[in-house]
């Protein structure tokens, strides 16, 4: 998880109190990655339960890393700033922030994520307009309905956008959040 930037705030151009680190929390406090866990906690964290807290930005960065062959790009919230004449005075520059996985691993994960859309739990996202690659998730929340998660990228063979969607107190990731991602992605791609 640390290789993907969990346990640290992403380098986003926002006030630091507006950014939350993803990771393992207890009682609202971010735990250290070195804090001990029992076998049940390790297993539960592996599929996104227990004390794991992830932000949509963090999960979009995970999807983006897979889309970019293992390289995680530094996120930015403003692409450019123009003066009153329309002249660009500040332009965001793409830069690698981390390399959490090897290219071969990213390729294998991409293939699996394409199958999620074409044959699996993300089939409600499938469209003839573009091949998407995605992963569903359903996070249990004590005292209310689950959080439906969906993260992915498109086009799968030449990614332009990575998106993560969470719909709180709802249903399954593929059933609820997947269609939201599909429509958002189609709009972003102009399709």
PLM regions and their residue ranges:
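Beta-lactam-recognizing serine transpeptidase/beta-lactamase-like catalytic domain environment
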Residues: 1-168
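Short amphipathic alpha-helical face segments that pack within enzyme cores
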Residues: 55-61, 176-183
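Extracytoplasmic/secreted cell-surface and envelope-processing proteins
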Residues: 71, 172-176
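Short, gly/Ser/Thr-rich active-site loops of penicillin-recognizing serine hydrolases
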Residues: 87-95, 180-191
């Amino acid at each position: 998880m640390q290789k993907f930037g969990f346990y640290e705030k992403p380098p986003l151009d926002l006030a630091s109190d507006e950014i939350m680190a993803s990771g393992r929390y207890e009682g609202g406090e971010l735990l250290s990655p070195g804090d001990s866990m029992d076998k049940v906690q390790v297993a539960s964290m592996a599929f996104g339960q227990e004390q794991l807290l992830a932000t949509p930005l963090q999960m979009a960065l995970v999807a983006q890393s897979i889309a970019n062959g293992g390289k995680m790009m530094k996120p930015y919230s403003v692409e450019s700033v123009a003066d009153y004449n329309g002249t660009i005075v500040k332009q965001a520059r793409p830069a690698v922030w981390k390399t959490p996985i090897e290219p071969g691993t990213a390729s294998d994960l991409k293939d699996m994520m394409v199958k999620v859309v074409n044959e699996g739990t993300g089939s409600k996202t499938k469209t003839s307009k573009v091949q998407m690659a995605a992963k569903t998730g359903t996070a249990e929340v004590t005292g209310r309905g689950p959080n439906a998660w969906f993260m992915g990228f498109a086009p799968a063979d030449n990614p332009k956008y990575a998106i993560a969607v969470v719909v709180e107190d709802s249903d399954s990731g593929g059933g609820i959040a997947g269609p939201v991602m599909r429509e958002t992605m189609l709009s972003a791609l102009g399709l």
